[in-house]
């Protein structure tokens, strides 16, 4: 149960952004799309705050399109891998493995080949708060899957964290540190062979 909550929290998405009164540049959505589409790979440390307040950390790897890996450090030690447009989650403590289609997760947006913040995705909130851009989106055809709030530094534009508001109304926050963009990643990181 803990594994599923962590997985859902790590993959699903976020709270509605408030308003700061700051005027946003008219092209900000286009700038965010360009920024996200310019990311071929991402490697970072993460800290996660689960809905129950538990804290965990580890490493995240993204290789667009379609591949993602979350490695949780002890005591969690969970592993989440997205490849072939499916997400495989393995909890070694319970020895349980769960598989879901990427498109059933709000974080699937970050794995798309061509990221668009319209059409399949609807923007629910857009605000600048304390020099950060908060962009909240949900899947247009599946609003019940949850929301994803992406938080960017503004100067320069950079992804700092995201929050997932899942279908049960629970929020999980993931903060990124030591982010490296467009660096080579070993393809073995995204193998699910040992997870089943």
Stretches with model-predicted labels:
Residues 1-7:
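Bacterial N-terminal signal peptides that target proteins for export
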Residues 19-29:
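Cleaved targeting-peptide boundary
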Residues 59-109, 172-173:
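An acidic-aromatic
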Residues 34-53:
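A short, Trp-centered hydrophobic/proline-enriched beta-strand micro-motif
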Residues 36, 106-118:
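Short, solvent-exposed helix-to-loop capping segments enriched in aromatics
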């Amino acid at each position: 149960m803990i594994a599923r909550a962590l997985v859902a929290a790590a993959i699903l998405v976020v709270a509605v952004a408030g308003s700061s009164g700051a005027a946003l540049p008219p092209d900000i959505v286009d700038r965010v799309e360009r920024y996200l589409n310019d990311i071929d790979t991402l490697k970072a440390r993460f800290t996660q705050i689960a809905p129950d307040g538990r804290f965990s950390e580890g490493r995240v790897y993204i290789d667009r399109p379609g591949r993602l890996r979350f490695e949780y450090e002890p005591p969690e030690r969970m592993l989440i891998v997205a490849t072939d447009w499916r997400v495989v989650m393995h909890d070694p403590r319970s020895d349980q493995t769960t598989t879901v289609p990427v498109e059933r997760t709000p974080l699937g947006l970050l794995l798309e080949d061509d990221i668009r913040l319209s059409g399949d995705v609807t923007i629910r909130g857009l605000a600048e708060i304390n020099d950060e851009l908060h962009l909240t989106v949900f899947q247009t055809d599946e609003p019940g899957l949850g929301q994803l709030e992406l938080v960017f530094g503004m100067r320069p534009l950079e992804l700092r964290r995201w929050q997932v508001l899942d279908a049960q109304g629970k929020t999980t926050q993931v903060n990124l540190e030591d982010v490296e963009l467009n660096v080579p990643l070993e393809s073995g990181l995204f193998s699910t062979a040992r997870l089943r």
